[in-house]
Amino acid sequence: MNLNATLFAQMIVFFVLWWVVARFVWPPLVKALDERSSKIADGLAAAERGKEALALASNEAEQELNKARQEGVQRVAEAEKRAQMSAEEIRANAQAEAARVISQAQQDAAQQVTRAREVLRAEVAVLAVKGAEQILRREVDAKAHGQLLDQLKAEL
């Protein structure tokens, strides 16, 4: 029976082929599949770590953005406060300057009033002398009556 010998030969060839595949082909295939599996697992783990890092970086960026916004608001508030203080200082300086100018003007006016009174006293004295001269139709001696005129001037 050739069938048995053929079957037996096929079984021997099968086992030899199986042994060759198990010995030489199967380990590199398993190794390649294991390496591929580990690379995929590492890639998935790296992707997960990347997602976590992205979420962390996103949170940090949001915190930094909020911090920058708060600092901006604070700086604007400080600038407004400084501007308000500067405006108040300018207003106070202007009021002080206005008070000084008003005081100076009042002093000048008082001095002008005093000068005008002195001028008027002198003119009144001269007019009084001329009036007396005309009334008496004679010349009044200015030296003789100088003290009298100065006293009159002081009274006016």
Swiss-Prot record:
GO terms for molecular function: proton-transporting ATP synthase activity, rotational mechanism; proton-transporting ATPase activity, rotational mechanism. Coiled coil: none annotated. Its main location: membrane. It is found in: Cell inner membrane. CDD domains: ATP-synt_Fo_b. Keywords: ATP synthesis, Cell inner membrane, Cell membrane, CF(0), Hydrogen ion transport, Ion transport, Membrane, Transmembrane, Transmembrane helix, Transport. GO terms for cellular component: plasma membrane; proton-transporting ATP synthase complex. It is a single-pass membrane protein. The chain crosses the membrane at residues 7-27. PANTHER family: ATP SYNTHASE SUBUNIT B, ATP SYNTHASE SUBUNIT B', CHLOROPLASTIC. NCBIfam families: ATP_synt_b, PRK05759.1-2. HAMAP family: ATP_synth_b_bprime (MF_01398). F(1)F(0) ATP synthase produces ATP from ADP in the presence of a proton or sodium gradient. F-type ATPases consist of two structural domains, F(1) containing the extramembraneous catalytic core and F(0) containing the membrane proton channel, linked together by a central stalk and a peripheral stalk. During catalysis, ATP synthesis in the catalytic domain of F(1) is coupled via a rotary mechanism of the central stalk subunits to proton translocation. Component of the F(0) channel, it forms part of the peripheral stalk, linking F(1) to F(0). F-type ATPases have 2 components, F(1) - the catalytic core - and F(0) - the membrane proton channel. F(1) has five subunits: alpha(3), beta(3), gamma(1), delta(1), epsilon(1). F(0) has three main subunits: a(1), b(2) and c(10-14). The alpha and beta chains form an alternating ring which encloses part of the gamma chain. F(1) is attached to F(0) by a central stalk formed by the gamma and epsilon chains, while a peripheral stalk is formed by the delta and b chains. This is ATP synthase subunit b. It comes from Polynucleobacter necessarius subsp. necessarius (strain STIR1).
